[in-house]
């Protein structure tokens, strides 16, 4: 089964993201706005149990994460994804790094850029128009997220929460 690890931002930030996603993101119906901490990976049921135990330890030893967003950006020319750029901080970078260690071993395909996607799979012209409009929009958002989630993918392509991990909490 395919799994992934994400942070879900506040409803306020999700509403901002969704105001664009419903028009510009074909994955809008498959997963709420999120910040991907670990790209999707395959696990058996037995491996999933081990990973849950490991993630519980990671969470216990981590602190809540501050998300600061001050602008929209894009991964162009690599791809036409437009996102709200989350300013990197020690907590989020450390958690991302841990999520590629044992037992979740793997090598990220790209350098980790904390972000919340608002548009993807756009034509070059549409990407240019949407990004130009969003870069004119002021955004100054800060919030603290105290949990992350292990998700799994259903047969229809949508993602659902398998387990939630509270940052800095025993248990």
Curated annotation (Swiss-Prot):
<keyword id="KW-0378">Hydrolase</keyword>
<dbReference type="InterPro" id="IPR009097">
    <property type="entry name" value="Cyclic_Pdiesterase"/>
</dbReference>
<feature type="short sequence motif" description="HXTX 1">
    <location>
        <begin position="34"/>
        <end position="37"/>
    </location>
</feature>
<feature type="short sequence motif" description="HXTX 2">
    <location>
        <begin position="115"/>
        <end position="118"/>
    </location>
</feature>
<feature type="active site" description="Proton acceptor">
    <location>
        <position position="115"/>
    </location>
</feature>
<dbReference type="Pfam" id="PF13563">
    <property type="entry name" value="2_5_RNA_ligase2"/>
</dbReference>
<comment type="similarity">
    <text>Belongs to the 2H phosphoesterase superfamily. YjcG family.</text>
</comment>
<dbReference type="InterPro" id="IPR050580">
    <property type="entry name" value="2H_phosphoesterase_YjcG-like"/>
</dbReference>
<protein>
    <recommendedName>
        <fullName>Putative phosphoesterase BPUM_1117</fullName>
        <ecNumber>3.1.-.-</ecNumber>
    </recommendedName>
</protein>
<dbReference type="GO" id="GO:0016788">
    <property type="term" value="F:hydrolase activity, acting on ester bonds"/>
</dbReference>
<dbReference type="InterPro" id="IPR022932">
    <property type="entry name" value="YjcG"/>
</dbReference>
<feature type="active site" description="Proton donor">
    <location>
        <position position="34"/>
    </location>
</feature>
């Amino acid at each position: 089964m395919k799994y992934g690890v994400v942070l879900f931002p506040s409803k306020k930030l999700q509403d901002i993201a969704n105001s664009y996603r419903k028009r510009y993101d074909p994955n809008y119906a498959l997963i709420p706005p999120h910040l991907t901490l670990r790209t999707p990976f395959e696990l058996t049921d037995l491996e999933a149990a081990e990973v849950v135990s490991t993630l519980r330890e990671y969470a216990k030893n981590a602190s809540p994460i501050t998300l600061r967003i001050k602008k929209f950006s894009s991964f162009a020319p690599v791809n036409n994804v437009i996102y709200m750029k989350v300013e990197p901080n020690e907590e989020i970078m450390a958690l991302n790094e841990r999520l590629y260690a044992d037992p979740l071993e793997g090598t990220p395909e790209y350098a980790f850029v904390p972000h919340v996607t608002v548009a993807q799979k756009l034509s070059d012209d549409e990407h240019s128009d949407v990004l130009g409009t969003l870069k004119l929009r002021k955004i100054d958002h800060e919030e603290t997220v105290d949990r992350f989630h292990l998700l799994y993918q259903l047969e229809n392509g949508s993602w659902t929460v398998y387990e939630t991990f509270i940052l800095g909490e025993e248990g």
